[in-house]
Amino acid sequence: MNSRALRFAGPAILAAVALVALVGSLAFGGGAAPLLVGDPGPVVRWMLPVAQLAVNLSAAVMVGALVLALFGLRAGERPFEAAVDAASVGAAIFTVAAAATAYLTFLNVFNATPSAGEVFGRQLGDFLVGTELGLAWLLTTLFGAVLTVLTFAFRGWTATLLIAALAVVALIPMATQGHSGDEADHNIAVTALALHIGGAAVWVGGLLTLTVVRGHLDRERMLALLRRYSSVALAVFVVVAGSGIARATVGVVSWEYLVSPYGAILLTKVAALLLVGVLGAVYRLRLIEGIRTAATAHRFWWFIAVEFAVLGLASGAAVALSRTPPPVDTTLPLPAVRTPSEFLTGAPLPPEFTLQRWLTMWDIDLLWLFVVGFGLFFYLVGVWRLHRRGDRWPIYRTVLWVAGLALLAWVTCGPMNAYQDYLFSIHMLGHMLLTMAIPMFLVVGAPVTLAARAIHRRTDGTRGGREWILWAVHTPFAKLVSHPLVAAAVFIGSLWLFYYSDLFRWSLYDHLGHEWMVAHFLISGYLFVQSLIGIDPVPLRYPYPFRLLTLLGVMAMHAFFGLAIMMSNALFVAEWFGSMGRTWGPTPLEDQYVGGGIAWSVGEIPTLILAIVVAIQWSQSDERAQRRADRHADRTDEQELKEYNARLAALAERDARAGR
């Protein structure tokens, strides 16, 4: 299969197999069956999933092409331009498909008859801006339109990176669709679906982009690109598989689900993904090197065509699965009246928080579980690389990095994540650990220094992990936020702004707000600690006395913040914490008082440790400076001291002559 044929055959195979799989799965599972009440008609029932499939595939092209361009190609050259061109086309199709999905979803939900009348237009407008479902698709369409313009207009390194970040954000509203919003474990379902969509987009879109740029690269450069894509694909396969398992665990209530049409489609999708994983392992381990010769290269690209077919099967089954109603478990009791906790959080009230539950209660946050897992894996791989080539890496840095990640996992996936929606004090304890304790461990682990030493340097003008990390560290924005004064201001200002504004309310009501809160406070704490005791390079490092003064100021503001909460008689987000219906533990106001005490006392402990570390580093810095001065004096036979004494003697002699 030549380059031109594969450029068109790859997307055609993917789209055709996906469409056939979609139609077959819908017919088998009843996802497009007529509704007993309010049926919108066969056109809407069949065209809506087709439009959703177009959204998914075009999103994959848009995201995957940008990611592959950033990590595998060189800006300014024709292959890079071709990849971004593919992203532009994908964004344009994504916009049209999202708009069509929004329109068809409106017809499906409201059973409206299309017309050019004012009433129909007003109903459509109310749906798009007045309902969560309509707003999600409206935002998706607007994101697509903006991305279409940006991908056509900008092609540099930085611009493409920002556009790629926006493209990933554009996928978030899609994660609220399907069955995710209806399930009891809503947060897990939404997070799993978001990770699943994002990972699949990078995987499928990257593979499509390989066929697009193949004709613009010689065999050696194509071989290098395939290796880089293979590494990225391996990482996203882990994400797609892990999130898919979590998503299926939420959706499949019992094993009987698997013998239903819903279960059959689910198993088909799982089998297709596993097969793609096997195919990926085969070409990673055995076939990539074969593109050096024409005969084996021909076999390799036919192998890729087969992978497109299997990915099409998985893509079609995935869309059909989101439209197929799961079986009803008749053995479950009828739902009782919803409790206040279920009304607010979507989950029943957990059991009383006891000492035992500090170690036994878990509530997994899939996003941070992946962050911890990848952070641990890549760090240990970096240490192993240094050890293998004979370089030394202090063991204490590795131990502290692992301890920091373990503490992060415990905070985001353990008892604090399970009880923070119900107890303000637990929420505050988790916040203090995120901003103060965890960053201390991670900063001393020096991940940037390790990455700079362990990741292979690119010599062909492309950018890999090492190049992007070093670029990020030296950007003007990084210089601004890592400035000690700015880092301290963001660190302490965020504390007050978050709790005394609607941001706190947003983090409770919206899972996206919760994830933003965790990321923001972890990063702000990391930047603050890095500016004080960091080992990694920073644009500006203030003198030690100034660092201690900064810490004293932060300690004072922390104390004021904690005291303000303890002295307050007004309950934070009273309609949440005051309406939870807890029958155990302290009252909401008493619990808030405890939370204020935690902010004052527990928050000061890491600050005190930081002050001790800064003082120790100051002392060690003075000792190193003295040793350098002593070595310099030994090398020069104390020539500077002799010259200084000679000048003093000359001045004394001159003064003596003047006195006579």
Predicted regions and their residues:
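Alpha-helical membrane segments of multi-pass proteins
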Residues: 1-660
